[in-house]
Amino acid sequence: MSLDHIRNFSIIAHIDHGKSTLADRLIQFTGALSERDMKEQVLDSMDIERERGITIKAQSVRLNYKAKDGKTYVLNLIDTPGHVDFTYEVSRSLAACEGALLIVDAAQGVEAQTMANVYLALEHDLEIIPVLNKIDLPSAEPERVREQIEEVIGLDASEAILASAKSGIGIEEILEAIVKRVPPPKGDLDAPAKALVVDSWYDNYLGVVSLARVYDGVLKAGEKIRFMGVGMDYPLDNVGFLTPVLTKVAELKAGEVGCIMAGIKKLSDARVGDTITTVRRPCASQLPGFQPAKSMVFAGLYPVDSADYEDLKDALEKLAINDASLNYEVETSPALGFGFRCGFLGMLHMEIIQERLEREFDLDLVTTAPTVVYRVKQTDGQIMDIRSPGDLPPTTKREYIEEPYILANIMVPAEYMGPVMQLCTDRRGTQKDMSYISDTRVMVQYEMPMSEVVMDFFDRLKSMTKGYASLDYHLLDYRMSDLVKLDILINGDPVDALSVIVHRNISQYRGRELAKKMKELIHRQMFDVAVQACIGGKIIARETVKALRKNVTAKCYGGDITRKRKLLEKQKAGKKRMKQVGKVEIPQEAFLAVLKVD
């Protein structure tokens, strides 16, 4: 197969704009799968991807298409995730392509995440083909959306393809546009082999399977290959294509995208973004930089039953095999026992990992409040990264604390502008820009602390705009802030899993609200339970969960008051003794309450 007949392309879109459905139609149209094997969202292989209707891991498929010019082309589709947390996955997928289909919902128009992905594609110099999807909807306005694409993104949308992935309209036009407009890959077959790892996943029988784009040379089964980033050598057992079913072949040549199976046991040895070459004839340099995924949000995961600790450890190991952006380390908590401090790309990533642990591995988990990475300058001049409120040094040992700030792009219908601006201001945001994309839609830019976004900002934004707002954000820098650690004491003992780092201005309010919430959630015991919120040793709020008590004077009937008093005093002394030895069970909901306090 000559390079001229290969096209590598990806699909970029906002969540729910019909990307995976379009991929299904392309697979169906080119006959890559029989009718019997077709199911909705073929490329979304995880149950949770299908249920939530989102793509998490980048997947890939090789299609053979006979074009109108009579030639047969090989089209390599690399599917990309569309959610803000998975931008790193998108950038890897785009690096392996020469072109991209930009899918925009003809009813909803350009969304924040569409913009972010388009800019990524333009950075990689890709040929972008705009496609207006869902044109069969009664609310579709293709002309308005065309203007939006031209005004907001600056792409020429006069030749944008009108399509409907659901009813199969415009699929052939899309395939023809890919053949005509996407440039063929460049590559030298005689040069030393050089390939980029686009994705890696774990197969129970084959070990780690890596999806790679070959730039130069040939990778043959039976050769020894080297992963240059980690410096590991492996015998190459098999190579193959995904059609989307794995099909083995003898070799992968320059320009092609395929799977590499080398019996690798650990995913960390086949890092995404690494360069593969052969040991016999290595290439001179690695492909330009891919950074390892950086965790932005940290949370503690603990098993409800401490006997499940080993199961949780195994489950995290298995998930980390398939998810290079998840990292974790062992953590112990006096309140919750043994568990793990896990790092995630963002809030959605965290929810998905948690859901997969509970669903696929049948674990009951307690999750602590998520925190971002704070930076502290200590009095001895050292800079320290704080991933958990428990790591924060005391006030006497720190000079200042810095927290990460993000630039948030929010697209919102004009009628909801007021509440959205109020929400951003409440979350310590400062407005940077505001522009009308159309008569009814506004794009606003806010700089705000990331810690204010990780809690429940996205949920609040969606609910106050009836689901019409879209959000995209990226990290700006670290800035000094007046932050304090808020502790919750139960009967005088701090519960580390309930500690949070908050801004001083709202710390009093948060403390009061959290104490009230705890009072509601902690079950009544046989003795009084004091719930206190404290900052740096100073108690700022207190609530008492009243004791359950038996009516000890019920059997007295008439008689002297001193008799009743004696019984009550005796009960009081008993409760006091009980309080000294009694342990308070804190229910799972109490740990989640930290997230819900507004």
Swiss-Prot record:
PROSITE patterns: G_TR_1, G_TR_2. It is an enzyme of class 3 (hydrolase). The keyword Methyltransferase does not apply. Residues 4-186 form the tr-type G domain. The keyword Cell membrane applies. It comes from the Bacteria. It catalyses: GTP + H2O = GDP + phosphate + H(+). It is found in: Cell inner membrane. Its EC number is 3.6.5.n1. Gene3D superfamilies: 3.30.70.240, Elongation factor 4, C-terminal domain, Elongation Factor G (Translational Gtpase), domain 3, P-loop containing nucleotide triphosphate hydrolases, Translation factors. Belongs to the TRAFAC class translation factor GTPase superfamily. Classic translation factor GTPase family. LepA subfamily. PANTHER family: TRANSLATION FACTOR GUF1 HOMOLOG, CHLOROPLASTIC (PTHR43512:SF4), TRANSLATION FACTOR GUF1-RELATED (PTHR43512). This is Elongation factor 4. It comes from Magnetococcus marinus (strain ATCC BAA-1437 / JCM 17883 / MC-1).
